[in-house]
């Protein structure tokens, strides 16, 4: 939850007070020159230097925070909550943790925001044997609202709903600030180290449609946390270790005996994997050799490590093709990275008396978990449980993570909760201090509402899905005649923007907790809540000023000089929608549900359409088509809308184009 602005301002005030105090202390120390012959003089000089150093640091910090605060977008909802929190505290000081319920109003007649706390406070007072109606409570809250620049007026409706009407002057100035400074993130109280574990395919297997969700959702979460200013580590927890590498190395030795000196031409690693698996299942001698290869690999025998690296490199190159298509940045850190750390993890659990032996296995029962974690198999080998525990410990203790987010399918929910619980039990982290969360997601379904498969029943390869998206998006653009008006370069840019944008948006626009139906026809439809509709809307908005011969430089200059007029109801509605962007982002930072951003962008686009249909931005002579009037205030509202949409697209990993 973002801290209210009052806390931030109080922090600045405290810093300013401390600066004055430190300055006075330095002055006092300067006046102590007469004690030069005493032994304490050197100590006083040292203290003086420390105070000066601290003073300079504080001044620099203060200037940076003021500069950042002045440019940042304001979370209006949070500020209204702060105002009403103050009012409720003044009206009912005896209440601890009084409920704060502030939401945007659904209808203009109920103002711009509503505070619905009175009903809940009635119940709290009733429990204290005080019988007061919600309307009386609302009235008392209203009388205690502090002076502020946001709220123009309030009125009480129904049983005790408080309708909040914003100052148009305040809203106008916030739009101007956005236009001058660009779309800036809301101020965060503390920059944190955030580790996001996502994508995570297995070496020697192709990425399939199931990897799409983790990859797209994880990337978008990273983009959001990066935008607001956190230090994000994007990790690809590759499946690059295990017994399957024994059969792959044995097959490599047979098929490419000179692999140590000549790079083997493994064109299709999936087929290579299937061939080795077939031999492993059918040939006992091959199976024995495969197990021997596993032992050699675990002992880190150089030739076997080289073979393992060759196989991993082939896979990584194939994965990178997909990451390049989807514009995904990620650091590979597979299970192999944690192998040497697993021994220490097992030892730590044993030393703390947390290990039980079950049929030769070493298991751990985390609190509240009925299924144990197996940290050592009966044959002495480690498991995925051991690997995940080692990864958790490394991220907490070596990476110093303040937050770890695992973007893994919901089928792993019990396993992830067991791992987290074990981490708490052994004392690696305190959930009150460190946020560790499983951002689970449902499966991708075909239009038959069954798991998405090819006609032959195979899992859909992700690269094939992306290629099909490119093909269909080009067909869609040609159906609209865009190949006749766009240059070859513009057409190619539009094709990739629509193809990959639609695939990502179709996923992100659904609540990640639910399964979703994959349909190219629906995602490429330019009507409704789709990327196609939003991308077309964006290019249309961007073209308004261009067709009026107004350059970006003209708009930027006008933003500093032009007052934003919000007299028409559609101007007012659009401005409020634009300024809700920070509160939308804050909600997603809290719950990691990205469909909220998609819903907001769709609402913004449809609200803009209402505005554009009712408010002339550029007036032309009906006979000649010549421009007779440009409403710069409205053009700036267009520009602000496009700027917020562009930043929303960026967080979703979608690349809009200027022409489509």
From Swiss-Prot:
CDD domains: ArgRS_core
Pfam name, any one: DALR_1
Presence of keyword Ion transport: no
Function of the molecule: Forms part of a macromolecular complex that catalyzes the attachment of specific amino acids to cognate tRNAs during protein synthesis.
Catalytic activity field: tRNA(Arg) + L-arginine + ATP = L-arginyl-tRNA(Arg) + AMP + diphosphate
Entry's localization field: Cytoplasm; Cytoplasm, Cytosol
Organism name: Xenopus tropicalis (Western clawed frog)
Domain comment (free text): The alpha-helical N-terminus (residues 1-72) mediates interaction with AIMP1 and thereby contributes to the assembly of the multisynthetase complex.
Name of the protein in its database record: Arginine--tRNA ligase, cytoplasmic
BP terms from Gene Ontology: arginyl-tRNA aminoacylation
Signal peptide segment: none
Organismal lineage: Eukaryota, Metazoa, Chordata, Craniata, Vertebrata
